[in-house]
A protein has these predicted regions:
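A short gly/proline-enriched turn/hairpin at secondary-structure junctions
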Residues: 56-59
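Acidic, metal-coordinating catalytic segment for phosphate/diphosphate chemistry
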Residues: 1-34, 38
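Short, solvent-exposed loop/turn segments that connect beta-strands within catalytic domains
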Residues: 39-43, 100-103
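Unchanged
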Residues: 62-149
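Short, acidic/hydrophobic/Gly-rich beta-strand patch recurrent on exposed beta strands
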Residues: 45-49
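A small-molecule sensor/coupling module
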Residues: 150-157
């Protein structure tokens, strides 16, 4: 992650003289995808974690030397157990979050992907389950609105191709 200079980097102990130090800010990038298949309609692979009730799209951070596309394919394959290939780029979600005193400015690159093999029972342990859901059900189930927006865009792209 690339570090953005903060007040502590410049020797100042507070932001704007308010007496409170500014949190460190770091940039973060990840990549993943909306994996689809055509069954009796469009189905989307989503990942669930029972410990916190989160349902999301598969994604993760780049390994050294990886392109964003390589990261997306690797992370989606690991988290879903599926072999996938990229069809098209859907878009980028940008957001901020804080963890352990650090503010992160994150960009998540999402790709439309189709499955070429594999089995969801072979997913890694980041999520408890991976399920194929009809697109409408996936939209209702996903925890984060920004991921549902990516699924909406993916559906439009799939419908334009079929």
């Amino acid at each position: 992650m690339k570090k953005t200079p903060s007040a502590s980097d410049s020797g100042s102990s507070s932001a704007g003289g308010g007496g409170r130090p500014r949190p460190r800010v770091e940039d973060a990038v990840s990549a993943g995808g909306v994996v689809y298949r055509l069954n009796e309609g469009i189905e989307i692979a989503i990942c669930g974690r029972t410990s916190d009730g989160v349902w999301g799209l598969p994604k993760g951070t780049p390994d050294p030397g990886e392109t964003i596309e390589q990261t997306a394919v690797r992370e989606v394959s690991e988290e879903t157990g599926l072999q996938v290939e990229i069809v098209a780029k859907i878009g980028v979600v940008e957001y901020w979050f804080a963890r352990e005193g650090v503010r992160y400015h994150k960009w998540v690159h999402h790709f439309l992907m189709q499955t070429t093999g594999g089995d969801t029972s072979q997913h890694d342990l980041e999520y408890d389950k991976v399920e194929w859901r009809p697109v409408e059900d996936a939209l209702r189930t996903l925890t984060f609105r920004n991921e549902a927006n990516m699924v909406e865009k993916a559906r439009e792209m799939i419908e334009a191709m079929t």
